[in-house]
Amino acid sequence: MVSFVALIPLFPIVGFFLLLPLGKKLGYPKAGWLGTTAIFLSFVASVITWVGLLARTGTHRVFVDHLFTWMNVGSLKLGIDLYLDPLSMTMVLFVTGVATIIHAYSIGYMKGDPRFHQFFVYLNLFVFSMIVLVLAGNIPLAFVGWEGVGACSYFLISFWFEKPSAATAGKKAFIVNRIGDFGFLLGSFLLFYWVGSLNYVNLFGGHLILSKGSATAIALLFFLGAAGKSAQLPLFTWLVDAMEGPTPVSALIHAATMVTAGVYLMARLAPILRLAPTASMVIAIVGVLTAFVAAAAATSQDDIKKVLAYSTVSQLGYMFLAVGTGAYVAAIFLMVTHAFYKALLFLGSGSVIHSMHDEQDIKKMGRLRRYMPITSVTFIIGWLSIAGFPPFSGFWSKGDVLTAAFQKSPLLWLVGALTAILTAYYMGREVMLVFFGDSRWSAISGSGHQGGHEVGEHEGDMHVSAPHESPRIMTLPLIILAVLAVLGGLLNLPFASSTRFL
């Protein structure tokens, strides 16, 4: 099993280095398929590793694959170590799985873009960085992956840098995240100063000795880092502007990489949070306030992608609410199910934008279910999932979070429940305005792409005058994600103990 672990990050970085010199020569669609294959092979290696890990029990489910020594300076001893446990394997499974689907979708969506190959160069590097963050066996190596996803988000958000708004959004994301990085670094320094190690085996392998004050300071500093990366109050504004990037980038950032990094970090540091009840309560309060404020903001948005952007901020708030109340499994469970339905919703919005010739104003849409049956049905499934309707995956995962919140504080539960009602409302509003009602798109011009090009496949060389279903390379990923959004709740059902892995 260990021999397959190193292959998980190896395939994406090999894809990156192959696409750098060969991508332009390969062109469309070969460059896209090369990048997609690299991520798919990483997913296969993840599945094989997961099966091997599943066969183990207890402490045997935690082990380290030491590749080589990185630093050995005084008492600081660090290696390039891959840390395997149920948490890291759960993360790497959904990261590589969802990323594979998004890569395949991008082949159709980015057709015609002059820098088609460059897009997949960045995507492969993005996924590699996230895998390094998740599998890192020590905090400094995790920080390398942490910075890697930050850099790649800058490249991809500002991919259409010809648009001033895209270039500005990329810079904003990069700068805001530097604020969080300060907390990550300072927390790392204090942890090493007080504990004497930054290796996970030493930190979490036995009894962690920290005073309550020290644990609180470290936890809050790492939470500052997580708040920047995972868009919590007041550092969430960059994520809304990140919609300037191509829609597959939005799906990747919001579902599988980047914003999930902060939640993962806090779940990984759970032994420290258990020693810091004050910090945990701060995390829960910030999380539930972020969830409510973002949900309220989403109710007034008319841009199809900005509704989803605020929705992501809100759902991340739920995850931090779970972390703050000590429900770490519930936080990761929500993260996994959220990856399924949020990737589905973003890719579905991309299908709509593609069909509407770049129009993103939901008040200029309507009745698209008649012209886009696959997109409409799958998008509705995503809506039912995020709204928490049974038996869709969001019902089970969000229910776990609210249960934990009620046990901690009825007030936290009340705000979380109100947020759930707002979520059902603003997503229902988007569905109704886009797919139902009267057609409001007759005035849309079919003369060409606007501004920075939301590029997709066209019929011949001309834009069609009426909306149309997207090509199969774009609709098949929607169907797969819709199935996962329906069945994802089976991963952690309370009455099915055999499925409980975390």
Model-derived features: positions:
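Membrane-embedded helix-loop-helix hairpins and adjacent transmembrane boundary segments
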Residues: 3-17, 41-44, 48-51, 407, ...
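Hard-cation-handling environments
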Residues: 455-458, 464-502
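Transmembrane helix-loop-helix hairpins at membrane boundaries of multipass inner-membrane proteins
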Residues: 1-6, 22-93, 97-121, 193-212, ...
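Hydrophobic transmembrane alpha-helices and their helix-loop junctions in integral membrane proteins
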Residues: 97-145, 151-464, 490
